[in-house]
């Protein structure tokens, strides 16, 4: 899947940031279904601003890759929608989305009064996102605080300067990020999250239990460049890593399980999933 800029007035994110446009395309397609699992009324606007999707490459491995991305993106979005909603219903009022990308949950989910939602991402991503949201006159349903920061740098200082209250419980979402980090960087990021989290804080992220997807990408010439962006994440099961670092896993669900419950197919590997943990 490739995207081209539709206008010189809005700069489209590049590199890993471009994958956020791809996920917006997945959400736009799902939102157009009569049996949709969620509704993102802004997703299509991001795709349009990027010039629209254009399929690249032959059938076969590429087609299977697109199907897996679509399935993963749909189930991931619904799972974490429910995760954030349940946290808010349980009294959590401080939320942080790391690598927020083109996430529009601040605008499309219902939030209790007093909710503060921090979106951390690169300045160019946040600028693109806001420019598109402005064209749709989008209004956030919670106090939305954008934090321009590189997650490879000292993002925690930027977050606290923006108003994060580390002594309060925080609900963290690390969505679509860890696969683009190597084991050391992924562990460092999650360790930093832990240092900013008091007991009762929550953490949600996705996990991949095998290398099928990366192997498939590397074996497909049209996708080899994208494959270089993927670093593998933690390198071990988060079900083992989290308990050693002060977290208790509350929920871990495979994509295939969620898809079956929704009456949807689950193409590709069956070992990817999503989890929620709480700080001990």
From Swiss-Prot:
Record key words, sorted: Methyltransferase, S-adenosyl-L-methionine, Transferase
Keyword Methyltransferase assigned: yes
Principal EC category: transferase
Record-listed E.C. numbers: 2.1.1.-
GO molecular function, one term: methyltransferase activity
Pfam hit, one: LCM
Domain of life from the UniProt record: Bacteria
Transmembrane segments: none
One GO BP annotation of this record: methylation
InterPro entries per record: Ppm1/Ppm2/Tcmp, SAM-dependent_MTases_sf, SAM_mthyl_Trfase_ML2640-like
Sites where the protein binds S-adenosyl-L-methionine: 121, 150-151
Cysteine disulfide links: none
NCBIfam families tied to this protein: mthyl_TIGR00027
Assigned protein family: Belongs to the UPF0677 family.
Free-text function comment from the UniProt entry: Exhibits S-adenosyl-L-methionine-dependent methyltransferase activity.
Protein name (record): Putative S-adenosyl-L-methionine-dependent methyltransferase FRAAL3836
Phylogenetic classification of the source organism: Bacteria, Bacillati, Actinomycetota, Actinomycetes, Frankiales
């Amino acid at each position: 899947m490739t995207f081209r800029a539709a206008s010189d007035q809005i700069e489209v994110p590049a590199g890993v940031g471009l994958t956020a446009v791809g996920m917006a395309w997945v959400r736009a397609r799902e939102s157009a279904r009569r049996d949709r699992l969620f509704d993102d009324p802004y997703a299509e606007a991001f795709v349009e601003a990027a010039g629209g999707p254009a399929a690249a490459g032959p059938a076969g491995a590429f087609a299977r890759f697109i199907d897996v991305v679509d399935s993963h993106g749909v189930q991931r979005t619904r799972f974490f929608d429910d995760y954030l909603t349940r946290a808010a219903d349980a009294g959590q009022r401080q939320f942080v989305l790391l690598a927020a990308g083109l996430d529009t949950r601040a605008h499309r989910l219902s939030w209790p009064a007093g909710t503060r939602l921090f979106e951390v991402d690169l300045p160019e991503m946040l600028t693109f996102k806001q420019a598109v949201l402005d064209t749709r006159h989008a209004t956030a349903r919670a106090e939305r605080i954008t934090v321009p920061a590189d997650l490879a740098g000292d993002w925690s200082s930027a977050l606290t300067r923006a108003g994060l209250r580390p002594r309060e419980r925080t609900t963290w979402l690390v969505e679509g990020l860890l696969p683009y980090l190597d084991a050391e960087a992924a562990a460092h990021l999650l360790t930093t999250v832990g240092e900013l989290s008091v007991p009762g804080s929550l953490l949600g992220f996705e996990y991949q239990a095998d290398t099928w997807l990366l192997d498939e990408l590397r074996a497909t010439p049209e996708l080899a460049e994208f494959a270089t962006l993927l670093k593998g994440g933690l390198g071990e099961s988060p079900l083992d890593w989290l308990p050693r670092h002060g977290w208790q896993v509350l929920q871990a669900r495979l994509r295939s399980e969620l898809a079956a419950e929704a009456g949807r197919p689950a193409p590709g590997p069956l070992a990817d999933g999503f989890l929620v943990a709480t700080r001990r």
